[in-house]
Swiss-Prot record:
A GO term from the CC aspect: cytosol
InterPro entries in UniProt: Ara_Isoase_C, AraA_central, AraA_N, AraA_N_sf, Fuc/Ara_isomerase_C, Fucose_isomerase_N/cen_sf, Lara_isomerase
Annotated protein name in UniProt: L-arabinose isomerase
Catalysis performed (reactions): beta-L-arabinopyranose = L-ribulose
Subunit record text: Homohexamer.
Regions that span the bilayer: none
SUPFAM superfamilies the UniProt entry points to: FucI/AraA C-terminal domain-like, FucI/AraA N-terminal and middle domains
Gene: araA
HAMAP family attached to this UniProt entry: Arabinose_Isome
Signal sequence segment: none
Annotated keywords: Arabinose catabolism, Carbohydrate metabolism, Isomerase, Manganese, Metal-binding
UniProt source species: Salmonella paratyphi A (strain AKU_12601)
EC number(s) from the headed UniProt entry: 5.3.1.4
Length: 500
């Protein structure tokens, strides 16, 4: 069972009574056939539910009102099978607060050249019915997605499925609670921000709990539960000699297990699905949570270090979006560079907290090593390299008057040499279009040093995320040129200033 099983998407057919009962009967029949086929053949992440035809303003308004108040409804897919006068949709669309996708399709793929008549033409009017619907969306300044293609086309299935992921993630985000253990790292700017504005824009709440509250729960964990979790570690990871049963760091592993169990219990009891820690606020904890954070991220929790609640929330959102897809998604930080003509590289990592969902190794190494930052006992952590291939890094930043999503398309590569002294998980990548352009554009756009790294999602997913939440997006990819990128930032400043 996944999060998508908790939601459904309503399939709504637009028409009108002008065409008579027989035409509406055929429209309903076609709709039932299409919905059944999509549910069984399209591999969509959640179920489509066919609703009654929308043939009048009252019917359409009732559907939109019901969608708003049904917690299982993640959004609406609308198909204008015949012509459906768009003034009928104004009241419904004006109150609709769920995501909307217009499926610009028709029942038949090919025209019946020898038999086509006006009855056929009146029944299959998506070509201009869809344009009428599009006009009212533009006139009302309402953002909605559009997918064009025959309902049996696999590309259309893929695009509808990707939109469904966005719709479900938006509903999950409205209920998301972010727990901050302690505050932000002192004097850091980009990890701070307006939590009230974030809740108004996205729906997620951000609140702080004292580390002492967490410590109470951690200290309540029994030895039996710790031993059971250690057994799971033994079967899932390659333990270094120091962390094995008679190793000199075995107690550190047990303490890491205690912290993991306590953290998970605290998060579950509070209904939190994202959290932050900071190495400057660890009072009562024996080590900086490393292994615990890595494993919780792999279970779907959002996380970021140093109190960075925006990145923690974004990671949770992207975890939901990517559920069931190939590839992982993790908290990440651009840590250091490799400058080599024609082969500039970025080494990404963090002090400890990189999610094993992006690991190339089937069994990462579990080790305990010294960490000077935080001033605590040596923490346990998983060490691994990252899968290769196309990926993205994304940053959500607070500009005061709006949010900007910054995305850099990257290509992860195999580490050319072993890293025997690096005691943390890492990812190595080439930034698109090149490191100088990518880093300069990132800096000019105000991108954070913390990001969400993902092999599972791509630029199109993040564009849809920005559109569905109505926020700015700035893209750095192989098409990026700095003069044009700077111009786009200036134009966006004007556009969003006027939009306020």
């Amino acid at each position: 069972m996944t999060i998508f099983d908790n939601y459904e998407v309503w399939f709504v057919i637009g028409s009108q009574h002008l065409y008579g009962a027989e035409t509406l009967r055929q429209v309903t029949q076609h709709a039932e056939h299409v919905v059944n086929a999509l549910n069984t053949e399209a591999k969509l992440p959640c179920k489509l539910v066919l609703k009654p035809l929308g043939t009048s303003p009252d019917e359409i308004t009732a559907i939109c009102r019901d969608a708003n108040y049904d917690d299982r409804c993640a959004g609406l897919v609308v198909w204008l099978h015949t012509f459906s006068p768009a003034k009928m949709w104004i009241n419904g669309l004006s109150i609709l607060n769920k995501p909307l996708l217009q499926f610009h399709t028709q029942f038949n793929a090919a025209l019946p050249w020898d038999s086509i008549d006006m009855d056929f033409m009146n029944l299959n009017q998506t070509a201009h019915g869809g344009r009428e619907f599009g006009f009212i969306g533009a006139r009302m300044r309402q953002q909605h997605a559009v997918v064009t293609g025959h309902w049996q086309d696999k590309e259309a299935h893929t695009r509808i499925g990707a939109w469904m992921r966005q719709a479900v993630s938006k509903q999950d985000t409205r209920q998301l609670k972010v727990c901050r253990f302690g505050d932000n790292m002192r004097e850091v700017a980009v990890t701070d921000g307006d939590k009230v504005a974030a809740q108004i824009k996205f729906g997620f709440s951000v609140n702080t709990w004292a580390v002492g509250d967490l410590v109470q729960v951690v200290n309540s964990i029994g030895d039996g539960d710790i031993s059971a979790l250690i057994d799971e570690y033994e079967s899932s990871y390659t333990l270094t000699p120091a962390t094995q049963i008679h190793g000199d760091k075995r107690q550190n592993v047990r303490e890491a297990a205690r912290i993991e169990l306590g953290m998970k219990r605290f998060l579950e009891q509070g209904g939190f699905h994202a959290f932050t820690t900071t190495f400057e606020d660890l009072h009562g904890l024996k080590q900086l949570p490393g292994l615990a954070v890595q494993r919780l991220m792999q279970q779907g929790y959002g996380f970021a270090g140093e109190g960075d609640w925006k990145t923690a929330a974004l990671l949770r959102i992207m975890k939901v979006m990517s559920t069931g897809l190939q590839g992982g998604t993790s908290f990440m930080e651009d840590y250091t560079y490799h400058f080599e003509k024609g082969n500039d590289l970025v080494l990404g990592s963090h002090m400890l907290e990189v999610c094993p969902s992006i690991a190339v190794e089937e069994k990462p190494i579990l080790d305990v090593q010294h960490l000077g930052i935080g001033g605590k006992e040596d923490p346990a952590r998983l060490i691994f390299n990252t899968q290769t291939g196309p990926a993205i890094v994304a940053s959500l930043i607070d500009l005061g008057d709006r949010y900007r999503l910054l995305v850099n398309c990257i290509d992860t590569v195999k580490t050319p040499h072993s890293l025997p002294k690096l005691p943390v998980a890492n990812a190595l990548w080439k930034a698109q279009p090149d490191l100088p352009t990518a880093s300069e554009a990132w800096i000019l756009a105000g991108g954070a040093h913390h990001t969400v790294f993902s092999h599972a999602l791509d630029l199109n997913d993040m564009r849809q995320f920005a559109e569905i939440h109505d926020i700015e997006i700035a893209v750095i990819d192989n098409d990026t040129r700095l003069p044009a990128f700077k111009d786009a930032l200036r134009w966006n400043e004007v556009y969003y200033g006027l939009k306020r």
